[in-house]
A protein has these predicted regions:
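Conserved acidic residues
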Residues: 69
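Short amphipathic alpha-helices and their capping/turn segments at secondary-structure boundaries
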Residues: 59-64
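Short helix-loop capping/hinge segments that flank enzyme active sites or metal/cofactor-binding pockets
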Residues: 4-58, 106-116
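Positions that flank functional sites
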Residues: 1, 79-80, 110
Length: 143
């Protein structure tokens, strides 16, 4: 579903990254420097195909707008990590690509650690999604 995302990110960081390298490059990690070399190989046609794929995904998602006010997913594909790790934010990639608001609600728990539920809404419906999230948090406190 998100195969175009790395290409979009690569294209959008290509020139700022090159500017950092030009100034000396010591401000970036070796891993990022390697990625910049990969980004250099990308061309405008690849970027445009990636944008078209993103547009198609957003159009498909828009068909659900009258069907659902929100969607519930987990915030992370695994249980909460122990400090100092922060976990995997892969579910946030979906809402970012869709241009959809998302709220992480600490509704679950594992090993005494909060485990978030992600409430994702329709684009430009941030306020409505916030109201739903507030209601969900209230229900959990009462229950």
């Amino acid at each position: 579903i998100l195969e175009f995302r790395p290409a979009l990110a690569a294209w959008e960081i290509k020139w700022p990254g090159a500017a950092v390298v030009e100034k000396g490059g010591d401000a970036i990690t070796s891993g990022f420097a390697e990625r910049l070399a990969e980004f250099d190989a990308m061309n405008l046609d690849h970027y445009r195909r990636s944008l078209a794929a993103l547009g198609a995904l957003r159009r498909d998602f828009a068909r659900f707008e009258d069907f659902a006010d929100g969607f519930i997913t987990l915030c992370s594909p695994t249980m909460p990590p122990l400090y100092p790790e922060t976990g995997d934010s892969v579910f946030g990639d979906v809402s970012s690509c869709l241009g959809a608001p998302a709220w992480s609600l600490p509704l679950l728990e594992d090993r005494g650690l909060p485990m978030g539920v992600q409430l994702m809404g329709n684009p430009h419906r941030d306020y409505e999604l916030g109201c739903i999230g507030r209601w969900m948090m209230g229900q959990m406190r009462e229950g």
